[in-house]
Amino acid sequence: MADEALSIYDEIEIEDMTFDANLQIYHYPCPCGDRFEIAIDDLRYGEDIAVCPSCSLMIKVIFDQSDLPKEEKKETEGVSVKA
């Protein structure tokens, strides 16, 4: 989706957003009373539009990849397989 086709409510610096480490999302208050949300994985893959789940408003998140928290490596449990 091209940004020109979207109706963007505002542009917000990522430093002004709140990061929820448990849910791995950034959020920012929406005028409707809910909040804009965007997943950190979406940001890592180049997505920069946060949406409000309660209304039609969207914001553009201004950030550099270096602004994002380091990606946590998920440890996998070793599984032994006997043939």
Curated annotation (Swiss-Prot):
Transmembrane segments: none annotated. Residues 8-64 form the DPH-type MB domain. It is found in: Cytoplasm; Nucleus. One of its GO terms (molecular function) is iron chaperone activity. Fe cation binds at residues 30, 32, 52, 55. One of its GO terms (biological process) is tRNA wobble base 5-methoxycarbonylmethyl-2-thiouridinylation. SUPFAM superfamilies: CSL zinc finger. It catalyses: [3Fe-4S](1+)-[protein] + Fe(2+)-[Dph3] = [3Fe-4S](0)-[protein] + Fe(3+)-[Dph3]; 2 [3Fe-4S](0)-[protein] + 2 Fe(2+)-[Dph3] + NADH = 2 [4Fe-4S](1+)-[protein] + 2 [Dph3] + NAD(+) + H(+). Belongs to the DPH3 family. This is Diphthamide biosynthesis protein 3. It comes from the Eukaryota. Pathway: Protein modification; peptidyl-diphthamide biosynthesis. Its main location: cytoplasm. Keywords: Cytoplasm, Iron, Metal-binding, Nucleus, Oxidoreductase. PROSITE patterns: DPH_MB. One of its GO terms (cellular component) is nucleus. Its cofactor is Fe(2+). Component of the 2-(3-amino-3-carboxypropyl)histidine synthase complex composed of dph1, dph2, dph3 and a NADH-dependent reductase, predominantly cbr1. Pfam families: Zn_ribbon_CSL (PF05207). The DPH-type metal-binding (MB) domain can also bind zinc. However, iron is the physiological binding partner as zinc binding impairs the protein electron donor function. Required for the first step of diphthamide biosynthesis, a post-translational modification of histidine which occurs in elongation factor 2. Dph1 and dph2 transfer a 3-amino-3-carboxypropyl (ACP) group from S-adenosyl-L-methionine (SAM) to a histidine residue, the reaction is assisted by a reduction system comprising dph3 and a NADH-dependent reductase, predominantly cbr1. Acts as an electron donor to reduce the Fe-S cluster in dph1-dph2 keeping the [4Fe-4S] clusters in the active and reduced state. The gene is dph3.
